[in-house]
């Protein structure tokens, strides 16, 4: 089976992706502050190898404040205040999962280590400017990533929150995989159906039904 190194390596041969990476590099060299740091842009793939993927959570673009983004969607580094969307994710987990205690941090690496690919659809952003890298080619790259998961894996649970993530649903074969959709957890839309969606318990029910080990969502509580 291919690895993420294979997938990313073959995309780096494509003209569109060469242009994406060159633009990001030249912005950094020109002194613009770009998040996450260059060494962490592909963090999601380092922590969750292709043959380990059981769940995919799709975000949009990285957090654009200092010390927040580290390459995993919705996650922030330890010691950084939990952002509002993640506060709502925790709120739904507390409602959905017995004994879930809201953590005092937003560091989600322990989910990634269990097979939850925490993927933004755009992997870089300029400081203080949301969506500033939305049209650099990252979307094409993450389309390829989803196509690869669709083709290589079986029984993956995709959590698609908000219209942006749901658009990516067109690449997913629903006879091989599971798709759970809800409004985005941001404060603007969480109360339109994200709170109450039950996606975390439902993900584990679907994994268990296929003989796969469930995700210990509580791993962030410890």
From Swiss-Prot:
Belongs to the uracil-DNA glycosylase (UDG) superfamily. UNG family. It is found in: Cytoplasm. Excises uracil residues from the DNA which can arise as a result of misincorporation of dUMP residues by DNA polymerase or due to deamination of cytosine. Pfam families: UDG. The active site is at 61 (proton acceptor). PROSITE patterns: U_DNA_GLYCOSYLASE. This is Uracil-DNA glycosylase. Keywords: Cytoplasm, DNA damage, DNA repair, Hydrolase. SUPFAM superfamilies: Uracil-DNA glycosylase-like. InterPro entries: UDG_fam1, Ura-DNA_Glyclase_AS, Uracil-DNA_glycosylase-like, Uracil-DNA_glycosylase-like_sf. GO terms for molecular function: uracil DNA N-glycosylase activity. It catalyses: Hydrolyzes single-stranded DNA or mismatched double-stranded DNA and polynucleotides, releasing free uracil. GO terms for cellular component: cytoplasm. GO terms for biological process: base-excision repair, AP site formation via deaminated base removal.
């Amino acid at each position: 089976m291919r690895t993420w190194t294979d997938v990313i390596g073959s995309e780096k041969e494509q003209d569109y992706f060469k242009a994406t990476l060159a633009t990001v590099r030249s912005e950094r060299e020109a002194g613009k502050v770009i998040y996450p740091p260059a060494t962490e842009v592909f963090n999601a793939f380092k922590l969750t190898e292709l043959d380990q993927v059981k769940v995919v959570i799709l975000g949009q673009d990285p957090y654009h404040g200092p010390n927040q983004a580290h390459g995993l969607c919705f996650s922030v580094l330890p010691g950084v205040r939990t952002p509002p969307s993640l506060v709502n994710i925790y709120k739904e987990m507390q409602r959905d999962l017995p004994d879930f205690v809201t953590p005092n941090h937003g560091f989600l690496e322990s989910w990634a280590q269990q097979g939850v690919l925490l993927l933004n659809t755009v992997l870089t952003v300029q400081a203080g400017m949301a969506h500033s890298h939305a049209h650099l080619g990252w979307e094409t790259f993450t389309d390829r990533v989803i196509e690869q998961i669709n083709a290589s894996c079986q029984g993956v649970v995709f959590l698609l929150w908000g219209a942006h993530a749901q658009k990516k649903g067109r690449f997913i074969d629903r006879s091989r995989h599971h798709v759970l959709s809800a409004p985005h957890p941001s404060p603007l839309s969480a109360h339109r159906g994200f709170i109450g969606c039950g996606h975390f318990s439902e993900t584990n029910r679907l994994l268990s039904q296929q003989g796969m080990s469930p995700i210990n969502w509580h791993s962030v509580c410890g």
